[in-house]
Amino acid sequence: MSKLNIDQKSVRALFSEKKADFLIPDYQRPYAWGEKECQTLWDDLFLFAFPDNDCDKFNSDSDEYFLGPIVTFKNDDGKMEIIDGQQRLTTLMLLLRAFYEKYGSMKNDKAVKTSKFIEQCIWKTDEFGDPDKSALKIDSEVATDKEKDEFLNILKTGTLSDCEKSSYANNYRFFQQKIVDFLNTYPDWFSFFPIRIMNNCILLPIEAESQDTALRIFSTLNDRGKPLSDADIFKAQFYKYYSAKGEREVFIQKWKDLEVLCDSIFHPITGTPMDELFTRYMYYERAKQGIKSSTTEALRKFYERNAYSLLKNDQTFENLINLADFQKSGHFLASC
């Protein structure tokens, strides 16, 4: 039976742990939240922190607001790879950074304490709790997200240029303006909002013992989102391979083109069109390797053999493209 570590924690308790080291892995999809989702989050948090628009009705000892699960597993580098919760965790980081940018310059005692707590959520700290602002608690390696560096730069510096238009930048600006409006409207409440978010908003971290277990949990919990497919995992292996060769951008474009092609060809009952392509290529490889067993192993199990060696060469990727072209035109030319 798979072992799970599940322990409900406040935002502050989870983010400020000394060992907290989150990674948005390369097989995840790019950040997708926009102003609509950020507005909903802001409104929900405000209504929770100030019930009936009254600061004094909040009970800091008992009031809690559940933000949802964070499904992770510890990879070989000791980082917690985020399988589920990427969008809300990223957005919470942007929100806290926006609070820090505003409160960090204030000299009021409560603002100073609040800023200290936020520092411990965003950056790694020394034994005295002082932050190393070059060492974030979260990193992103999302393969197809060209704007991820903007996210990391926002967390490190809190600044933006006018030319930065990513979802990260737009949402950060959104929160900055909401905080300005909040301080202008409720100046006496300024110290309570971020503290109540950090101390009383609850996340449910679920740490699985392996990637496969984490993905299964995600698929079970997430009935609204789009679970990661086998092809997403395979894409990460190709991405690492081509990045090491200095051909990352070329690969990303070819992969996007292949996705478009497969979407127009395959319409599987289960799985994604890209999963269907990998399934058909698996049968080709099984025949080429002389595998005669009538029992077909699971798709991911087949490709992950020998540390995904089949996905770490140029020919496999070219064969996949050729196979998709064949399905479109009827001419599959695979090289051995």
Question: How should each PLM-predicted stretch be described?
Answer:
Residues M1-I83, M93, S191, N200-L204:
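Short alpha-helix boundary/capping and kink motifs at helix termini
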Residues L4-F22, T125-I154:
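Short, compositionally biased low-complexity segments
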Residues W33-L45, D63, Q87-R88, E164-Y172, ...:
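Phosphate/oxyanion-binding active-site loops and adjacent basic polyanion-contact surfaces
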Residues F48, F99-K102, R224:
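Phosphate/oxyanion-binding loops and surfaces in catalytic or ligand/nucleic-acid-binding neighborhoods
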Residues R88-S105:
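Short active-site loop/helix that positions an aromatic residue
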Residues K137-C336:
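Polyanionic (Asp/Glu-rich) segments that form extended negatively charged tracts
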